[in-house]
């Protein structure tokens, strides 16, 4: 057995075995996902050890002061925990615009102890024990002493895939174009209308997951003008600042099953899901020029940011590729950067912890590898608790924070409905509906493209389908933009994937003018140059847009 550790940033491997007791499940990180996972597993009768570097359970919902929910699916163990939190709050705590963080913290710890889980706070992960690619236990530092324990399954709920990284698992971070992640916030608690309220402001970008980068970002944010105002207005009534950053995106594992926005939009669904993540593609920031084609098409060209999606998450997205004895639960599961904007909400991450714990319980009971967990037997248990919705609504239009009030959205299939949608002020659903029809959709778009009122949406639709015949009109929209920023920037997004060498001078001239279109022109030019370069080496199959069948 080998012990893998980092010493001053250098990975070391030495022979060694855990010296402490052995557990059925060790949960590393008792935040949003890990707290629910530990309680779930202990209630299943597993011997559970929970390790947390902070002084309490709950993560962003407790020590992070993020009191309200933003979407996420209903149902699951967290509903019981939230009900008990509200009951605790009613005993004399201040009313909040969500769940009182201290009350949630008390409930989580009480339920974990009641279920029999052992908890260690102030525990920093220092090493992982492996036999080949099977994780066998972990080592941690607490109160100046190194401790270790073995486990049949280790559940990584660290948010940054720390156990997975120490184990040697492959991870990714940020978007493909520049590695950029979503911005972080520093939550603050204010007293407003006789309630404690959470407030969030996008505060910056974390350069990397290192302690130095995190510390620098925290200090710069805490001492910035948003948090050291002069003077504070009476409406502010700041009660407290969170002692930790609200990080939306970091490392993500490469899983046995990787979830990609492109596949889901194309109707290529993964295996049977353990739960659904329910949210819109809540990308913070407006730098769509740097995003993937699918994100540009969905959020910028089609303007479908305000559509809530039900995204299926299978077991394979929780298993690091090629490894056993190790699961990941939290925002670091195997999704691409696009889906990371949605698969991160607190409700869904609590569901993720519950699902991972039940998968681990079955693997322990059957003494089988995690990849051989019988999902067919697992899904009824998840459905019983409400963690798995067996009949989800794939799309809803967001009109309320209460998802039950949001009306369903369905793809358009009738040509008359698609045409009417393209003529409307919100042509996005019609654009994607035509895209889903493939060649049939292209026939319709070509037919209508000669009409003045339909020329722009039909051009964009053909561009989304990957047909080069859209190029002349895309160039007109991009290089003679007039006052229509949306049409020009949308055309530039598509030229990034469809443009040719002859477009480079015009793109460079447009970028030189500056203004809002500059980043779109720059990224389009960069993409075309890269495509030309790889064409010379005959290694560009991933970069060339292909017409949709």
Task: Give the role of each language-model region.
Residues 2-6, 12-16, 22, 40, ...:
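Conserved N-terminal/central alpha/beta ligand/cofactor-binding core
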Residues 409-422, 438-450, 467-480, 500-512, ...:
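Amphipathic alpha-helical scaffolding segments comprising HEAT/armadillo-like alpha-solenoid repeats
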Residues 2-8, 16-19, 60, 81, ...:
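Flavin (FAD/FMN)-binding glycine-rich loop and adjacent Rossmann-like elements that form
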Residues 24-26, 49, 327:
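Conserved beta-strand elements of the Class I
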Residues 133-138:
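Short, hydrophobic/aromatic-rich segments at coil-to-beta transitions
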Residues 404-410, 425-439, 443, 447, ...:
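Structural detector for internal amphipathic alpha-helices that build alpha-solenoid repeat scaffolds
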Residues 17-31:
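Beta1/beta-strand and adjacent pyrophosphate-binding region of the FAD-binding site
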Residues 34:
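N-terminal Rossmann-fold NAD(P) dinucleotide-binding loop
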């Amino acid at each position: 057995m080998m012990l893998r550790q980092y010493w001053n940033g250098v990975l070391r491997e030495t022979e060694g075995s855990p010296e402490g007791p052995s557990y059925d499940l060790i949960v590393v990180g008792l935040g949003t996902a890990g707290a629910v996972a530990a309680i779930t597993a202990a209630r299943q009768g597993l011997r559970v050890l929970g390790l947390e570097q902070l002084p309490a359970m709950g993560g962003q919902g407790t020590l992070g002061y993020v009191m309200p929910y933003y979407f996420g699916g209903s149902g699951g163990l967290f509903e019981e925990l939230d009900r008990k939190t509200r009951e605790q709050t009613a005993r004399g705590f201040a009313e909040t615009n969500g769940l009182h963080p201290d009350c949630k913290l008390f409930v989580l710890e009480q339920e974990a102890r009641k279920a029999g889980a052992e908890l260690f706070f102030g525990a920093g992960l220092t090493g992982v024990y492996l036999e080949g690619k099977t994780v066998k236990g972990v080592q941690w530092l607490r109160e100046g002493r190194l401790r270790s324990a073995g486990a049949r399954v280790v559940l990584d709920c660290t948010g940054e895939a720390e156990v997975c990284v120490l184990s040697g698992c492959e991870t990714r971070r940020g978007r493909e174009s520049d590695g950029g992640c979503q911005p972080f916030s520093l939550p603050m608690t204010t007293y407003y209308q006789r309630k404690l309220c959470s407030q969030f402001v996008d505060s910056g970008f974390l350069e990397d997951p290192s302690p130095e980068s995190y510390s620098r970002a925290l200090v710069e944010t805490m001492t910035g003008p948003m948090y050291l105002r002069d003077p504070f207005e009476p409406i502010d009534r700041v009660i407290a600042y969170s002692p930790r950053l609200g990080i939306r995106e970091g490392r993500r594992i490469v899983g046995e099953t990787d979830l990609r926005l492109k596949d889901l939009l194309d109707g290529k669904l993964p295996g049977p899901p353990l739960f659904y993540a329910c949210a819109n593609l809540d990308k913070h920031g407006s730098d769509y020029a740097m995003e993937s084609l699918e994100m540009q098409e969905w959020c910028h060209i089609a303007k479908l940011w305000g559509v809530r999606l039900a995204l299926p998450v299978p077991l394979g997205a929780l298993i690091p590729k090629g490894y056993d004895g190790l699961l990941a639960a939290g925002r670091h599961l195997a999704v691409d950067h696009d889906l990371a904007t949605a698969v991160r909400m607190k409700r869904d991450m609590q569901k993720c912890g519950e699902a991972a714990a039940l998968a681990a319980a079955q693997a322990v009971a059957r003494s089988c590898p995690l990849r051989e967990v019988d999902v067919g037997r697992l899904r009824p248990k998840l459905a019983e608790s409400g963690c798995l919705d067996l009949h989800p609504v794939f799309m809803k239009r967001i009109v309320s924070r209460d998802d039950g009030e949001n009306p369903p959205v369905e793809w358009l299939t009738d040509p008359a409905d698609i045409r009417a949608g393209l003529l409307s002020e919100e042509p996005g659903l019609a654009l994607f509906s035509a895209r889903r029809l493939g060649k049939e959709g292209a026939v319709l778009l070509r037919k209508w493209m000669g009409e003045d009122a339909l020329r722009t949406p039909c051009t964009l639709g053909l561009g989304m389908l990957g047909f080069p015949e859209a190029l002349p009109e895309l160039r007109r929209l991009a290089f003679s933009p007039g006052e229509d920023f949306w049409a020009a920037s949308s055309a530039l997004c598509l030229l990034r994937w469809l443009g040719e060498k002859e477009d480079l001078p015009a793109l460079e001239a447009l970028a030189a003018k500056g203004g809002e279109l500059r980043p779109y022109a720059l990224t389009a030019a960069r993409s075309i140059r890269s495509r030309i370069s790889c064409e010379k080496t005959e290694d560009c199959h991933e970069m060339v847009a292909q017409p949709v069948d």
